Amino acid sequence: MSGSQTVSVIGYTKMAPQSPPATVNELWFIDTQAMFQNYANLRSFSKSNSTETQTTIGGVVFGRKARKQVIHVFFAYAEDLTESNLQFLESSLSSDIELVGNVNIDGQSTLIGNGTFTLQLSSKMLENKNTSEFLDQNVIFNNDHISMEGASCVSKVGFEWSLRAGREQEDVKSAAERLSMASFRFSYLNAEHELVIREHKPETAKQKYMDKFTKGALPYKDVIEFTAMQSLTRDTSNDTEDQKLVPTVKVTKDNKHFTRLVTIGEVVFPAYFGDSSFDLYKRAREALNRRANNTMMVTVNGIRSGRGVTTTTSATYLPPGWVSLLHLQLPSKWTENEKRNYRIRLHKLFNLPSSKPCLRLSQSLPLHSESVRLTNKKLIREPHLSISNYQPAGVVTAVKGPYNYHHYMQDGIDDSGWGCAYRSFQTIWSWFILNGYTDKPVPSHRDIQQALVNIGDKEQKFVGSRQWIGSTEISYVLNELLKLECRFIATNSGAEVVERARELARHFETSGTPVMIGGNMLAHTILGVDFNEMTGETKFLILDPHYTGSEDIKTITSKGWCAWKPASFWSADHFYNMVLAQPPTDSI
């Protein structure tokens, strides 16, 4: 199989070692470390019964042909390299990414899809992460980090599918096909900036706005919302901007018993600097097609497995190490155990880590104003990232992953003077939500108090009171509600807090959770440590729950409510206890 041969069948073939092509017309770019990590992630999963004796691994390569970039190399055991899995992978990726190649490992090649080249790999190369050997065997590639770029265009598209009893699978597939065939009729409007993405759309001066917006943009934070419209005519070439466009999807009913499946798809597609109107239209149409196909495949899988017809929720992710977004339809009404098993399958399919969650709904990106959120969208997220002009004294270790800033006077509760530990607890809980360890909402003060009553630590009259809690109570509630273990650091003075800086640094390196510290009748949240081994100088990144103002990031960072504090911040005359919540190591 030469680099130019295409394949459209599924299976494995034994291949003789290939010599590299004599000439190289175009170089592709690939991040070999990302490829090696994907292989390691797959191998980290324990094998299923069906793969217990299966050692053959292959893979598929997805990329951007126009840019000659390999974006993903997905590895899989032979049994998982199926046409349906290939279609599911493609339907979940950004609409500008397509199948570009296959993988040959130790002389055995994946024969699936229409790849234009084959990566020549060996088990030893992958296990040793040997970039030099890869480049020697694959001369059309340059090893380079591929940067994330571009803005995200996002729109909500609703569609209803009527499914006849006993023929649900057939009707789901037909409905998805009809929606894909009609996708050319959809247009996307942003009224604020007078932007229209549609078929037969001529270039206008408004394109300059898109170039300005997309230059230097990042897809997970730079977003333009569009309203989806559907043309009522088949030929859209002569439509004016305001003609024959309505936000509707036609539904055909018959006289038989049917199930009505309603889906609100979050259609997301990238926009890059220099894009033409036609570039955007092609990606928008492909993104809608992929949402329909992804919904169809998840629905059919649910029917085949005996779960019946289930609704799905659109979710967009930026998994760790990825430079493009992942788009999924998640089953809404499955049991928690069913959802967990499904997430494990997705982790294997997309070569995500086996030791930590990546695809919980709480980890999805709220790109649209109506995206699903499991935390209060008004709260400030990761305020420490907005601290500017800080010069480290030594080595900085800090919290890993997002969290929300909880402080006095939020949620309509006046807890000034007594609620600081409750707020620190809520900040810690938000970390566990946003990093995918739970979908349970942040507990209120009353919820926290009731949990302490339930375990026998407090009497019933404690519920609804304005009584303080401390580090011990926080650990009790985390264990009761989330089954989490906590470590403690107890000190007799503020000076001892400084002496435990190395221990705190190890916590942030390994666990990464915010740390609640209580002492001197106050509670704070430690987000990081700056420690100089040579001089002993130590500073602490503190999030102060005693703030009573509005969600103003400038005030919070400039007035010291989220700031680096010197060792003298801790009182020499008081003891302090720290709670270090431990994330589970087997949670997906």
Swiss-Prot record:
Record InterPro entries: Papain-like_cys_pep_sf, UfSP1/2_DUB_cat, UfSP2-like_N, UfSP_MPN
Membrane topology according to the record: Peripheral membrane protein
Keyword annotations: Cytoplasm, Endoplasmic reticulum, Hydrolase, Membrane, Protease, Thiol protease, Ubl conjugation pathway
EC class: hydrolase
GO cellular component, one term: endoplasmic reticulum membrane
Protein localization: Endoplasmic reticulum membrane; Cytoplasm; Cytoplasm, Perinuclear region
Active site: C420, D544, H546
GO function term, MF aspect, one: deUFMylase activity
GO biological process, one term: protein localization to non-motile cilium
A Pfam family recorded for this sequence: UfSP_MPN_N
Superkingdom, natural source: Eukaryota
The protein's Enzyme Commission number: 3.4.22.-
Subunit structure of this chain's protein: Interacts with odr-4.
Family as reported in the entry's similarity comment: Belongs to the peptidase C78 family.
UniProt function note: Thiol protease which recognizes and hydrolyzes the peptide bond at the C-terminal Gly of ufm-1, a ubiquitin-like modifier protein bound to a number of target proteins. Required, with oct-4, for the localization of a subset of 7 transmembrane domain odorant receptors, including odr-10, to the cilia of olfactory neurons AWA and AWC. Operates in aggregation behavior, and responses to oxygen levels.
Name of this protein: Ufm1-specific protease
Organism: Caenorhabditis briggsae
